A protein has these predicted regions:
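Conserved P-loop NTPase-based nucleic-acid remodeling module centered on helicase motor cores
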Residues: 1-46
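Phosphate-binding beta-loop-alpha motif at adenosine-nucleotide cofactor sites
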Residues: 9, 103, 181-183
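Conserved helicase motor core of SF1/SF2 NTP-dependent helicases
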Residues: 124, 131-183
Length: 183
């Protein structure tokens, strides 16, 4: 997504951006991109950006994610979350600040908005660990598959370990196509 959107390093939300927002809002916000670089996966440490990111990953509004039974208690409630989400959107995509800044989840969303004609074409695509893909990542796979000659998807729903980060193993389970079970 980064490459296909022609982004540069300065287009990606970084620690300075989150520090600026934290200072402006007087709330400690964490950089979700930092965890992904360090560990390969992760959600923000603070509950506010975690809920906002999970909403984007799951293709729902922040309000719907806030009301999800797994969300739990949120200090400050919905009004505080809404305030933070609006401030982040204004900072990243318009308003007073003349910039477009993306976190990794935003990149996937923008990639999925691209016209099919503008997407890369591949002879073969191999997706591994598919049981740990989120709804948003599955949308990306579907888009890429439309311009791919052969698509191989590997995964084991019994090995799904990233449900806490939005993984949706049911998409792998319900996938149509030829199946070959390896033992």
């Amino acid at each position: 997504a980064y490459k296909e959107l022609y982004l540069k390093e300065e287009d990606v939300m970084n620690d300075d951006d989150y520090a600026f927002l934290s200072n402006k809002l007087q709330i400690k916000l964490s950089n979700p991109n930092k965890k992904i670089k360090s560990y390969g996966a992760g959600l923000p440490d603070d509950v506010f950006t975690r809920i906002i990111d999970l909403a984007k990953i799951n293709g729902v509004t922040a309000h719907e994610q806030f009301n999800h039974p797994d969300t739990g208690h949120l200090p400050g409630g919905w009004l505080k979350l809404d305030y933070i989400e609006r401030a982040m959107q204004e900072y990243k995509f318009g308003g007073k600040y003349p910039r477009r800044k993306y976190d990794y989840t935003d990149m996937l969303i923008e990639f999925n908005k691209k016209d099919l004609d503008d997407l890369p074409q591949f002879d073969v695509v191999i997706i591994d660990e598919a049981q740990d893909l989120s709804w948003l990542q599955w949308q990306m796979v579907k888009r890429i598959a439309e311009k791919t000659k052969r698509l191989y998807i590997a995964g084991d729903d019994d090995q799904a370990i990233f449900k806490w980060a939005g993984a949706r193993p049911e998409f792998l389970i319900n996938m149509k196509g030829t199946r070959k079970v390896l033992s």
